[in-house]
UniProtKB/Swiss-Prot annotation:
Bridged cysteine pairs (disulfide): C38-C68, C44-C59, C51-C61, C52-C72
Cleaved signal peptide residues: 1-20
Record key words, sorted: Allergen, Disulfide bond, Signal
Record note on quaternary structure: Monomer.
Propeptide residues according to the Swiss-Prot or TrEMBL record: 21-33
UniProt organism field: Ambrosia trifida (Giant ragweed)
The keyword Signal belongs to this UniProt entry's keyword annotation: yes
Domain of life: Eukaryota
Identification of the protein by name: Pollen allergen Amb t 5
SMART domains named among the record's database cross-references: Amb_V_allergen
């Protein structure tokens, strides 16, 4: 239950910091890395999406590195 709460809180924080949401800027997925080695610029997701998050267990994934660079600065 604590993990669900923390994930929900994380999602709310991330979505509130996204500057512009549009069809190409939407978060593709949030992926949990089993090894906890998620960091900005790593590939994540089913089709090699790009991670945009600080070092940790959860990756916020976008369709392209350019979108990550735009939304994560």
């Amino acid at each position: 239950m604590k993990n669900i709460f923390m994930l929900t809180l994380f999602i709310l924080i991330i979505t509130s910091t996204i500057k512009a949401i549009g069809s190409t800027n939407e978060v593709d997925e949030i992926k949990q890395e089993d090894d906890g080695l998620c960091y900005e610029g790593t590939n994540c997701g089913k089709v090699g999406k790009y991670c945009c998050s600080p070092i940790g267990k959860y990756c916020v994934c976008y369709d392209s590195k350019a979108i990550c660079n735009k939304n994560c600065t």
